Amino acid sequence: MPAVYGDRMTTFEDSEKESEYGYIRKVSGPVVVADGMNGAAMYELVRVGHDNLIGEIIRLEGDSATIQVYEETGGLTVNDPVLRTHKPLSVELGPGILGNIFDGIQRPLKTIAKRSGDVYIPRGVSVPPLDKDTQWDFQPKKLGVGDLLTGGDLYAIVDENSLMQHHVVLPPDAMGKITYIAPAGNYTIQDTVLELEFQGVVKKFTMLQTWPVRTPRPVASKLAADTPLLTGQRVLDALFPSVLGGTCAILGAFGCGKTVISQALSKYSNSDAVVYVGCGERGNEMAEVLMDFPQLTMTLPDGREESVMKRTTLVANTSNMPVAAREASIYTGITIAEYFRDMGYNVSMMADSGSRWAEALREISGRLAEMPADSGYPAYLAARLASFYEAAGKVKCLGGPERNGSVTIVGAVSPPGGDFSDPVTSATLSIVQVFWGLDKKLAQRKHFPSVNWLISYSKYSGALESFYEKFDSEFIDIRTKAREVLQREDDLNEIVQLVGKDALAETDKITLDTAKLLREDYLAQNAFTAYDKFCPFYKSVWMMRNIIHFYNLANQAVERGAGSDGQKITYSLIKLRLGDLFYRLVSQKFEDPAEGEDALVAKFKKLNEDLTAAFRNLEDETR
């Protein structure tokens, strides 16, 4: 029997009970309050109104529930129905995630665009996140009936594309004895490929599993991270390194190049898979990612060129999409990242931008009439940020075979007006281990990436010492010297402004010129050229070694050239006599990694030897 409220009529499906419905009492932007919600659970998914808008219960009082709705709530009226679904907001995990683009609640945007023929998402649209009709090539491991499986075990492989193998993972809460495993062949993600019997109960499993977004996926144990996240950006790899499984924050005002750095990480880092969450970003930036990524290629160790998009998943929640879904998009992204981590992959997750995520929290908190804290943000802002960054780390995965995986989180934060005392910024900096601070003045001077080497830091240098010792035992000393030169230049700049460069000591002139070499020809990098868009770590080390070698030799020559009859070797003489070598130092960045490591290292070694020989000749002549 239809239930009539006012002039609206609610019709129930045959499978639904009237008791599963509540009714709207109040609408305030994305926040809806519904009555008659006895028995509802926190974070339960509900369908709101006649358009079946997706919502999530975020507060329960008596029989009324406060719901945040992930779609535009215009047109909802009092007494509209609210249907409970008895399950939390979850994401679908299985083959087909990579190369896809979802919104904040994992609706596939490409599929919706095809079905609706519109540039906007229709309200209440319900499309399965993963294509249920695609056939995947299922290759089971060497398992048979009677074998035992436990949560987290890898029992099959699916070639998701020519770049990534998708390991089919048994859900963490499942275990039992195999009663059926599908033979190798083509199956959809809805076909039963495994049956397990445990305590007399037989459970069927497909390649698809769902997981609640607000529940972290379990792991066997956390491990200490000791492998660097190589980004291809010299300033990050050499001076402020992160690790696979680290937490990083890119901080900078608008227009400093945060998005370019996070896109460079997605394109060139040594991660196996990338989850890029555009959280409240401009739609044009997500469109740029969608246009660029499919055309970008990465060279594999065997020489094959593959599209970067094949290892990437995009979660797009642009600034004109509903605010509540922006808050959920971070959790959707992290759940997808944890799923690939459980296969034994190193995953990078880019969250762009954390500030707009915090603004979404602030808006919802305001609608709920919660007590505002600093700058109107809710008091639990720091706790929410911490729980998000806590998902990062290197872990020993559940189940067999034994494997390690990691999730690296890189969060971009744009403090208003570049003010680093902003609550979101200070809360983020108290959590993350690596801080890449972008400088507006550097960006205005067209120095990109505009990472300020005086304020940025990395707390992972100690954890990576063993890696550097194996790679190049001299690197740590060279890096320390380079940092000292850059710091000394900052101190000297004030003196130069007062008395001019000519009044400085010879060693100080050398410091200023070496710092200029480091700044303009080492730390600055042109992302739009073939030779400099990506810098392998060996090239970064050799470039820095040669610049610091020049600095050390020039200082020694000046000291030895000082005598009772005055300064025989001045810095101006060094520049005059060694102009061609100085030019070769400046030109190191133009060496193209495509020539191969051996060819480049030979060139850098030759320059190193030529510098030593030239300074020796200069000293011999002036004796």
From Swiss-Prot:
Translocase keyword on record: yes
Catalytic reaction annotation: ATP + H2O + 4 H(+)(in) = ADP + phosphate + 5 H(+)(out)
Top-level taxon: Eukaryota
Enzyme class: translocase
Entry's family note: Belongs to the ATPase alpha/beta chains family.
PROSITE patterns named among the record's database cross-references: ATPASE_ALPHA_BETA
Classification via InterPro entries: ATP-synt_VA_C (IPR055190), ATP-synth_a_Xtn (IPR031686), ATP_synth_asu-like_sf (IPR023366), ATPase_a/bsu_AS (IPR020003), ATPase_F1/V1/A1_a/bsu_N (IPR004100), ATPase_F1/V1/A1_a/bsu_N_sf (IPR036121), ATPase_F1/V1/A1_a/bsu_nucl-bd (IPR000194), ATPase_F1/V1_b/a_C (IPR024034)
Keywords: ATP-binding, Hydrogen ion transport, Ion transport, Nucleotide-binding, Translocase, Transport
Protein name in the entry: V-type proton ATPase catalytic subunit A
Organism field: Beta vulgaris (Sugar beet)
GO biological process: ATP metabolic process
Binding site for ATP: 252-259
Coiled-coil annotated residue ranges, if any: none
EC number: 7.1.2.2
GO terms of molecular function: ATP binding; ATP hydrolysis activity; proton-transporting ATPase activity, rotational mechanism
Function description: Catalytic subunit of the peripheral V1 complex of vacuolar ATPase. V-ATPase vacuolar ATPase is responsible for acidifying a variety of intracellular compartments in eukaryotic cells.
